[in-house]
């Protein structure tokens, strides 16, 4: 399925929120081919890929990254030039109650994928072996908490994960770097800030608030809502990830952020203001969307602030986000308003 001179990229977790954006970007904006490997858990949705599903440069394999035999089959069958590893359990709240799933997928699954990639890479012709890339996509949560400082996370910030989720991703990051250092597997790591955009599973803050507001349900905000996050539009992130896997330097780490620091309460209030404009006909009994905001008990171990310094990827690879938080959030709200069936399924 590979076009002459173009890459064949294996994307794990390609039916997820960020993964599907990456797959769409590659198929719609490059001449590369994609093999989408996804287990299709609750958060995976092939509807996100209907626009490109019939493209001859796209293939889908329903495979668990913990299934080594199936991984070996996929590598042998499709012979990828690069791996973009996004398959992961990613919701912090779920990790608090079901940490074992996160250990299995995020740590053991990454190990199995690394070993399958290494076995495949070692038997490649020398010129192909040198060009091969293993790009591991991670989170800024591995760095811990910036509470009480004006600092930003850089690529050299020490790891200090606070939750079972971030600890599992930190472990995966360390495995990838160890395989690069020990076995010379050509690897790159990127760490991103909070993603948002159309098609996101509604357990995450922004889609949950949009969908609850449109249904007249409470808008639950942890604690006092003062926690700060940096927000990155998912399509900007997809462009960055493609640049990293095609242009990034082996052994390097790239932080990817939107320079959009907002408190959680600011985000929810901005969503409410957009809905007042774009969906003025409210559910019965709702005078203002903001009236639905409800403060709830804070999450255990809730980090106060994340903020990413994306200067390195801007300087070295020339990447810049195209969306402001305001423009990206408007597109996101409008998508949920325009996709009522998706809202009902969510």
UniProtKB/Swiss-Prot annotation:
**Enzyme category, top tier:** lyase
Please tell me where substrate binds in this chain: 90, 139, 194, 204-205, 220-222, 229, 264, 298-302
**InterPro entries, alphabetized:** dTDP_Gluc_deHydtase, NAD(P)-bd_dom, NAD(P)-bd_dom_sf
What keywords appear on the UniProt entry? Lipopolysaccharide biosynthesis, Lyase, NAD
CDD domains associated with the record = dTDP_GD_SDR_e
Which Pfam family, an example, fits this chain? Answer: GDP_Man_Dehyd
Q: What is its EC number?
A: 4.2.1.46
Which residues does UniProt mark as catalytic? 140-141, 165
Q: So where does NAD(+) get bound?
A: 17-18, 38-41, 64-65, 86-90, 105, 165-169, 195
Q: Which reaction does it catalyse?
A: dTDP-alpha-D-glucose = dTDP-4-dehydro-6-deoxy-alpha-D-glucose + H2O
Query: Which GO MF terms are attached to this record?
Result: dTDP-glucose 4,6-dehydratase activity
Q: Cite the annotated pathway.
A: Carbohydrate biosynthesis; dTDP-L-rhamnose biosynthesis; Bacterial outer membrane biogenesis; LPS O-antigen biosynthesis
Cofactor(s) for this UniProt protein? NAD(+)
Q: Does the keyword Lyase apply?
A: yes
Among SUPFAM superfamilies, the record links this protein to:
NAD(P)-binding Rossmann-fold domains
**Per the UniProt entry, what are the Gene Ontology biological process annotations, in alphabetical order?**
dTDP-rhamnose biosynthetic process; lipopolysaccharide biosynthetic process; O antigen biosynthetic process; polysaccharide biosynthetic process
Free-text comment on the cofactor: Binds 1 NAD(+) per subunit.
Chain's role:
Catalyzes the dehydration of dTDP-D-glucose to form dTDP-6-deoxy-D-xylo-4-hexulose via a three-step process involving oxidation, dehydration and reduction.
> What is said about its interaction partners and assembly?
Homodimer.
Q: Which family does it belong to?
A: Belongs to the NAD(P)-dependent epimerase/dehydratase family. dTDP-glucose dehydratase subfamily.
Q: PANTHER family, per this entry?
A: DTDP-D-GLUCOSE 4,6-DEHYDRATASE-RELATED
- The name of this protein is dTDP-glucose 4,6-dehydratase
Phylogenetic lineage: Bacteria, Pseudomonadati, Pseudomonadota, Betaproteobacteria, Neisseriales
